[in-house]
Amino acid sequence: GLEALALSIPPTPGQSIVKRPNNKNLFTLGSVFRSKGYNSRFIYGGYGYFDNMNEFFSQNGYEVTDINALKPNEITYENTWGVADEDLFKLAMKEIDKDYKNKKPFFAQIMTVSNHRPYTYPEGRIDIPSHTGREGAVKYTDYSIGKFIKDAGSKPWFNNTLFVIVSDHCASSAGKVE
């Protein structure tokens, strides 16, 4: 899951390292980039206290930005998990633009929320109605990522930026702990 991405290790079965006690000052991508002068960010479309993400990321080299950084007029759609991916990507763009303006290289781990049950997203963006299942959520996520990359293409930092797109967990990472 998230720890696999942050720690560059295979997903762990059972309880996520993100949720476990004594999980601070670990060797994470965020801490490595921070030690090299980068602003390392974890940007999440929901509330960072969910699943202990605020604590884990903030104690492991990341600055955490979540739904609380958005003003009410910046939220065009919200469901039980958080804001629409488009709203999250606009927030991420604003944070990245700040880093660029301050002449700081950046590393941003951005976590969207639309591709989770109940699979809801803003109407009219894609040809599959909201609330109808995973296929629509995946297509909306694809639409939002495409829009983000296209919008980023007009930014002065774009040509020096690597985009890596992965899921936050896979179906096979669950397991039992003895």
List where the protein language model places each region.
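Solvent-exposed soluble domains appended to multi-pass membrane proteins
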Residues: G1-E178
